[in-house]
Amino acid sequence: HNRSYEFWVKTSSLVTMVMVSLMIAAKTWAWLASGSASMLGSLTDSLMDITATAMSFLVLGYALRPADDDHRFGHGKAEALAGLGQAAFIAGSGCLLAFHSIERLFNPLELTHSLLGVWVSIFAIACTLVIVFVQNKVVKHTESIAIKADSVHYKGDLILNAAVLLAILLSYYGVLYADPIFAVGVAGYLLYNSWDIARDSADHLMDKELPDEEKQRILDVSKSHIDVRGVHGVRTRQGGKVKFIQLHLELDDHLSLIRAHNVADEVEAMITKEFESEVDI
């Protein structure tokens, strides 16, 4: 199971880095040729993307290590730390872009080579669709926080690239303020996205409980065992790919210690099967 998880997250990271590298090359060309502020915003976003993805790729290698004497609960929280790093990079790029865009609002420039910007934006949308498709499959198989954060960001990038395309087209037809206005919008999107990722990462670092729906599934599965009379003291958290669950089973007084131990093992197996993922109970 661990090998499967490692395969999926590394495949996602490699595909993402290849696609983003192609987009960076194309956007750099288009920005240098056109001088578009919104294209610069899109380029800045892609540069932050590849930095964050590379960082996630390195951190995931550490997060996938098995538990050791110094980290008895494993290294899964390294993913959440990577998420905080992503949030910081994205917030920084958003602030820089906002300053540049506001300056361009007061000093609008007529864009050149607009057609190149249009084709590069279409190319970027196609590359982003490939990334989102791969990441959706990976998240479905692994529930990786780092890949999930990336996926949310790239879904937003589809809108971002479409907005850049529209801004360049409007500027081509003489609406000079369209480019910096859209660039300010991109900056706002980056800042909002960084907050969302930071909040999700903080939840995992602070051991936030699993969703109520998942906790209810734990209760339902546990109570479905014929020898379980009740369940209390359920505590949960997530660390990387592993769901940590603690609970107390209420059993009949006449059960032997050996039978009670077997019931606990059987309930643990039932919960693990229910979630079809790595569970520590």
Range-by-range predicted roles:
Residues V20:
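Histidine-centered catalytic/metal-binding microenvironments
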Residues H1-T16, A26, L32-I281:
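Alpha-helical transmembrane segments and adjacent TM-loop junctions that form the membrane-embedded core
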